[in-house]
Amino acid sequence: MDVPIDFVIRSASAIDPDTLRTYAERRLAFALRRFESRARRVVVRLGDTNGPRRGIDSRCSITLQLRNGRHIDVEAVTAWPFASITLAAKRLNEALRRELEKDQHSVRRRRRTSFDALVEA
């Protein structure tokens, strides 16, 4: 994937940050493969919300900056950092797909109104 990815990892877990980084890169490459031309930059933040305590404490937030200047932010909180990355990447894919569908719908609407104006003239 040619899109630059910035990582901010704040974790008290025993998992190696490089392992998390590699996993996140792979998941994001999969989630963004169809939309890579529209992405400018990705920022991934991983952290433990509870510190060393147990419970749901692994948070992954992903910010995607699009080439048109818009930003898409998603977040996932689970008990396991790999699951947080996977869920956040899935949510990013869904949010990006919805964003692009909105753009396509508005372009179709503009074309239709332009065509209607020509027909009425």
Q: Where does each model-flagged region fall?
A:
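N-terminal, polar/charged subdomain of small-to-medium soluble alpha/beta proteins
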Residues: M1-A121
